[in-house]
């Protein structure tokens, strides 16, 4: 069995259920055991730094690649820091807004959401005769400590999460922002089309390589765990890739192995199966 020296973990749908910040007890125990065995454990996530920090209360990590590789931290040291340029930032935020796409701007200090999104969900709830959508969004915003866009102070943006009422609206915005790629999420939450900007200067795979270079580990001696399309660059960069059982089909087909779901304690079981525990 290969002796993997570095472990990379996606958060949403891998370490935790999507939109949550409390990992299963079994996953925390597995991380602690792997670190006792001398392995380095890193988060590799689309979340900005502020949104991943709640995870740091549950387990010790050796660092993280936040914002899909836009910010890489090893220990207390910034290894890579590459937000959007002011021009890119202004362009993408304006294009999305002009096309009626709701935005969550992710910065190092926090995530800022369009206030109009709640009004949109409230109207959908009235139409559907329930309060499910608004309760769902309010719970996510509270768990992830999101803030309203009116509080955004202009700090550098690393990525923008998009939630569009229709695919047509999102397609128009994407066509106007040719300087970016967009990763479409393969989970349609409440019939909304979800996507995230992808900066062509980096991705999760670059995050893996940056971390490995900083700690002197060959990427071939790393293993990663993910569940969705934005994890594919990470799958390609690490020596071995594992997709969660709850992951999308494209991610499962791209991974070297598939483990049980988050809900079934898949991460801890996979750590044991691949000899990562002390």
Regions found by a protein language model. Give the residues of each.
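Conserved acidic, metal-coordinating active-site core of Asp-based
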Residues: 106-225
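Short active-site oxyanion
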Residues: 38-42, 61, 158-160, 220-221, ...
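Mg2+-dependent phosphoryl-transfer enzymes with acidic/Ser/Thr/Gly-rich catalytic loops
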Residues: 2-6, 24, 194-278
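Short, structured coil segments at secondary-structure junctions
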Residues: 59-60, 68, 176-178, 237-238, ...
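Hydrophobic packing residues within well-ordered alpha-helices of enzyme cores
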Residues: 52-56, 173, 251, 267
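Short hydrophobic/aromatic-enriched beta-strand-loop microsegments
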Residues: 61-69, 182-185, 241-245, 259-261
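Active-site phosphate-binding/coordination module
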Residues: 22-128
């Amino acid at each position: 069995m290969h002796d993997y020296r570095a472990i990379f973990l996606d958060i949403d749908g891998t370490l935790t259920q999507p939109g949550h910040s409390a990992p299963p007890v079994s996953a925390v125990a597995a991380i602690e055991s792997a670190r006792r065995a001398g392995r380095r454990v890193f988060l590799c996530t689309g979340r900005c730094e502020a949104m991943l920090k709640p995870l740091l209360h549950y387990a010790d990590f050796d660092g993280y690649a936040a914002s899909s590789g836009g910010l890489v931290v090893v220990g207390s040291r910034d290894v890579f820091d590459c937000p959007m340029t002011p021009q890119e930032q202004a362009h993408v935020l304006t294009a999305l807004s002009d096309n009626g796409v709701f935005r969550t701007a992710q910065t190092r200090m926090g995530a800022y959401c369009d206030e109009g999104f709640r009004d949109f969900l409230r109207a959908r709830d009235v139409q559907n005769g329930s309060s499910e959508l608004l309760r769902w969004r309010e719970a996510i915003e509270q768990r992830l400590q999101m803030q309203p866009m009116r509080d955004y102070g202009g700090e550098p943006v690393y990525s923008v999460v998009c939630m569009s009422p229709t695919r047509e609206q999102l397609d128009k915005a994407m066509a106007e922002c040719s300087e970016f790629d967009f990763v479409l999420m393969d989970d349609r939450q409440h019939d909304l089309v979800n996507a995230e900007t992808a900066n062509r200067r980096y991705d999760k795979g670059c995050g893996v390589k940056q971390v490995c270079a900083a700690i002197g580990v060959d990427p071939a001696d790393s293993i990663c765990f993910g569940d969705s399309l934005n994890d594919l660059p990470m799958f390609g960069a690490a020596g071995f890739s594992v997709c969660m059982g709850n992951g999308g089909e494209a991610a499962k087909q791209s991974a070297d192995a598939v483990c049980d779901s988050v809900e079934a304690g898949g991460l801890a079981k996979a750590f044991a199966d691949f000899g990562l525990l002390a």
